[in-house]
Regions:
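Conserved ABC transporter NBD signature motif
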Residues: 63-74
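P-loop NTP-binding/switch modules centered on Walker-like glycine-rich loops
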Residues: 55, 174-180, 184-266
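Conserved ABC ATPase signature
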Residues: 149-154, 158
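A short, proline-enriched helix->beta-strand linker immediately N-terminal to the Walker B motif
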Residues: 169-173
Length: 330
């Protein structure tokens, strides 16, 4: 049994006179200890996927179809009381802004102790011992002193390490990390990612890493889902997707990486922008930006099917496939 199994997950947002589709029948599995990257531009549906997995969608968003099974239990429609026993305990989420997680008026120690006591029958002293141990695990110096501090007294990198420590408090089997380093300095980003990778490898925790950065995905994950306009358009081994992308959008993302451009040259870009939820075109959602698009692409939505070593949703994949090194871009 997979740790996490998602089938035909569809999420909609109720608007004044219509509902718009934010996730369109996405499916994937995550095995125990596996690290999965979800990548795409802003508006692709990455964060909505993460919030759906945690059953944290707020109105006007709602799951309109599909299943999310965590260790065999379907969490779609699960009562909040039952979900609380899973969320923060067996599943945990790391947000891109640590101040979303941390309460500014409580000390770090108060927040960690409250989290532990909400899920376990332990004393305050026992909870503080566990909190100190977890802070040491994420390489926070003088952890006993940090328990008495407030979030605003700590640096951004230190706050994010504490958020990771809180996520690990109850030894979860799955961590969902939503752009966990976006708000941090570049050098601190690398440290946090290295820490997260080390912790997942040592404790065999499953990881869903949501990011716009293919470079991060290449270093952190075993498999990758590429999302566009609420759909999965390419899925497979991270190594295969990075080295030999099949979808023109994925090719464009990789060609836009700084290391793909010679010094002094302009960075490559994918022309156009991601459509808004109420403007997703008929057919392939990427067709308005794709130089390979045909009338068939513009009229008929492609299914996600096996091609070579990955699953890809593209009518023209047989015609256009070429190694990234040949300069093919979307």
């Amino acid at each position: 049994m997979s740790l996490l199994s998602v089938r035909d997950l569809t999420v909609k947002f109720a608007m004044r006179d219509q509902s718009v589709t934010a996730l369109n029948q996405i499916s994937f599995d995550l095995e125990r200890g596996e690290r999965l990257g979800i990548v795409g531009e802003s508006g692709a549906g990455k964060s909505i996927t993460g919030f759906s997995l945690m059953n944290l969608l707020s109105k006007p968003g709602y799951i309109s179809g599909g299943k999310i099974q965590f260790q065999g239990d379907d969490i779609v429609g699960m009562s909040e009381a039952k979900m609380r026993k899973i969320r923060g305990n067996r599943m945990a989420m790391i947000f891109q802004d640590p101040m979303v997680t941390l309460n500014p008026v409580l000390t770090i120690g108060q927040q960690m102790v409250e989290t532990l006591k909400a899920h376990r029958k332990i004393s305050k002293a026992e909870a503080e011992q566990i909190a100190v141990m977890k802070l040491r695990q994420v390489y926070i110096p003088s952890p006993e002193e940090r328990l008495a501090q407030y979030p605003h007294e700590l640096s951004g990198g230190m706050r994010q390490r504490i958020v990771i420590a809180i996520a690990l408090l109850l030894d979860p089997e799955l961590i969902i990390a939503d752009e966990p380093t976006t708000a941090l300095d570049v050098t601190i980003q690398a440290d946090i990612m290295e820490l997260l990778l080390e912790l997942c490898q040592s404790s065999k925790v499953g990881l869903v890493l949501i990011t716009h950065d293919l470079g991060v995905v290449s270093q952190m994950t075993d498999r990758t889902l590429v999302m566009y306009a609420g759909r999965i358009i390419e899925a497979g081994s991270t190594r295969e997707i990075i080295n030999d992308p099949q979808h023109p959008y994925t090719q464009g993302l990789i060609n836009a990486l700084p290391q793909q451009t010679a010094p002094g040259q302009r960075l490559k870009q994918i022309p156009g922008t991601m459509p808004t939820l109420n403007e997703v075109p008929k057919g392939c959602p990427f067709s308005p930006r794709c130089t390979f698009a045909t009338d068939h692409c513009r009229s008929t939505s492609p299914d996600l099917v096996r091609h070579a070593h990955v699953d890809v949703a593209c009518h023209e994949v047989n015609r256009l496939h070429a190694p990234v090194s040949e300069g093919q871009s979307a």
